[in-house]
């Protein structure tokens, strides 16, 4: 199958196009922090010439503890998204968890994300598909790469072919994730754009007493490996103070390192996509 191109305004999302950054913060902690982080991303990506989509969640519905911070909720979250979009002229991506969220969220954001833990929930898939919005499907930690075809088929049969596939690691025993680089390449064979969530792939699920741990010190190494595959995009989360982030701080890139980090990712992407393809199957 040839590479599918998804058009998001002037941005082309495809495996053989320059990579698109899907980046921001894990969860909306406050309006002011979200605006500040969005401004930093916007400035850095514009400087480096990287197509960019702002990401944040309005509700983290799958936290380890019932007492953990979840976010401002949909109504307040959409107000913040609207302000970010208007102020910085950025396209937006966020996740939904329930059927009733799909339509109102799709009115504000440009891409809606299907969470990994919910990727087989047919009612949610159908509701997302019917919005006509671009969909980012997080590959569940418990599915093989080739099994993503079933989720793709559900979206297709519900009337939506604007699909991005996102790798975020696979379960490896207890409290651990690994990234199968060949698995990402296998997903690319579908023709749909594949992006790499290099933040959540660093998780240690349940690695803390009441929250997920992570391996922030290896954020660059893992992302470099993924970018060497020639992907449609990179998905990352950053925070000005990761140790005090309200969610997934152990995986978050320190915001002050964003520019140097992205310089390396762009250099790898440019190099890999300058090569002629090699068909080693023959």
UniProtKB/Swiss-Prot annotation:
The UniProt GO MF terms for this protein read: 3-deoxy-8-phosphooctulonate synthase activity
Q: Name one Pfam family in it.
A: DAHP_synth_1
Q: Which reaction does it catalyse?
A: D-arabinose 5-phosphate + phosphoenolpyruvate + H2O = 3-deoxy-alpha-D-manno-2-octulosonate-8-phosphate + phosphate
Pathway of this protein? Carbohydrate biosynthesis; 3-deoxy-D-manno-octulosonate biosynthesis; 3-deoxy-D-manno-octulosonate from D-ribulose 5-phosphate: step 2/3; Bacterial outer membrane biogenesis; lipopolysaccharide biosynthesis
Keyword Cytoplasm on entry = yes
Keywords in UniProt for this one? Cytoplasm, Lipopolysaccharide biosynthesis, Transferase
Q: Which BP terms from GO are recorded?
A: keto-3-deoxy-D-manno-octulosonic acid biosynthetic process
A Gene Ontology CC term for this entry? cytoplasm
- Gene3D superfamilies the record matches: Aldolase class I
- What parts of the sequence cross the membrane? none
Keyword DNA repair annotated: no
InterPro entries for the chain: Aldolase_TIM, DAHP1/KDSA, KDO8P_synthase
Q: Where in the cell is it found?
A: Cytoplasm
Q: What is its EC number?
A: 2.5.1.55
State the top-level EC class.
transferase
The UniProt entry's sequence similarity note says: Belongs to the KdsA family.
User: What HAMAP family does the record point to?
Assistant: KDO8P_synth
**What is the recorded name of this protein?**
2-dehydro-3-deoxyphosphooctonate aldolase
Query: Which species does this protein come from?
Result: Shewanella baltica (strain OS185)
Gene symbol? kdsA
